[in-house]
Amino acid sequence: MASLYDNEAKIKQAIIMLQKIVNDTSVPRNIRRAATDAIRNLQDSSLSPAVRAANAIGILEEISQDPNMPTHTRISIWNVVSMLETVKD
């Protein structure tokens, strides 16, 4: 059960990091929208933590290729993806 709590803690930390991106007005709107979608996926309690993380990773990896993304935002997204990749069932 400790693993479940670790996974939930990682997901909560990822949500906090993504909320910072959503609230940053220097980030283009489409990237903020993708971060909001990733947060929504992470908060979907009907799915297991690993599935929620995988869904969010898919959204974030797709948007991380956007050439309009500020460098600091890209690094934050990579950090979130790295954290979510460690979430396992």
Swiss-Prot record:
It comes from the Archaea. Pfam families: UPF0147 (PF03685). InterPro entries: Ta0600-like_sf, UPF0147. Transmembrane segments: none annotated. SUPFAM superfamilies: Ta0600-like. Belongs to the UPF0147 family. HAMAP family: UPF0147 (MF_00342). This is UPF0147 protein STK_04605.
